Every structure is written in structure tokens, then in C-alpha cells.
Swiss-Prot record:
Coiled coil: none annotated. NCBIfam families: L21. Part of the 50S ribosomal subunit. Contacts protein L20. The keyword rRNA-binding applies. This is Large ribosomal subunit protein bL21. Keywords: Ribonucleoprotein, Ribosomal protein, RNA-binding, rRNA-binding. It comes from Endomicrobium trichonymphae. GO terms for cellular component: cytoplasm; ribonucleoprotein complex; ribosome. It comes from the Bacteria. This protein binds to 23S rRNA in the presence of protein L20. One of its GO terms (biological process) is translation. Pfam families: Ribosomal_L21p (PF00829). SUPFAM superfamilies: L21p-like (SSF141091).
Amino acid sequence: MYAIIKTGGKQYKVEKGVSLVVEKLKGVEAGQEVILREVLLLADGEKLTVGKPIIESARVVAKVVSQKRGPKVLVFKRKPKKGYKKLQGHRQYVTELEITGINT
């Protein structure tokens, strides 16, 4: 059984026991359980359920493993012939989840 969920403006294919990194979820701490309600699709063997746009009765339960920062993204600006250079870095906050169950 797998599901397609939407969180942080992105869609993820999840199964029980899978861990994934999503955009930061506010107000949660490591070890806490979260319920993801935006389930777009459910697949269980032969049966496939597609939401319009979401499946109201479906829930995905996940455990927060950690809140951390993602990899550094470097932004480099340069103007030709003028010697202007600017290097800037950015690290986005992310939440690591482990899927514990899919409820239909």
C-alpha cells in the first residue's frame, strides 16, 4: 500500500516504514507524531483511489525524526569587466519524517 501526499507545496510518494525529508513543519518536535491530511491518491494492490483534489477520509501518520537544516545552496553574482563578485549561502530548514501508518 502506498499514498501520494502533499506537504510544503510538494508531492511525495510514501509507504509504511519509509523516511523522507520535507519542508519545515511548524510547531512540532523530534519524537512527536503528526497526521498528514492532504492525501491525493491511495493505492492498495489492485484498488486505486484518486481524490478530487484530496481524499477526505484518508490520513497518513508520521513520526518526526528531527528538525534540521538542509544542504547549503550557493548563490554567486558577478559583473563582467568590473571586478564585482558576491557569494552568498543559504540553508533551508527541513523536517525528517518516518511514516508509521496509512489510514483509509
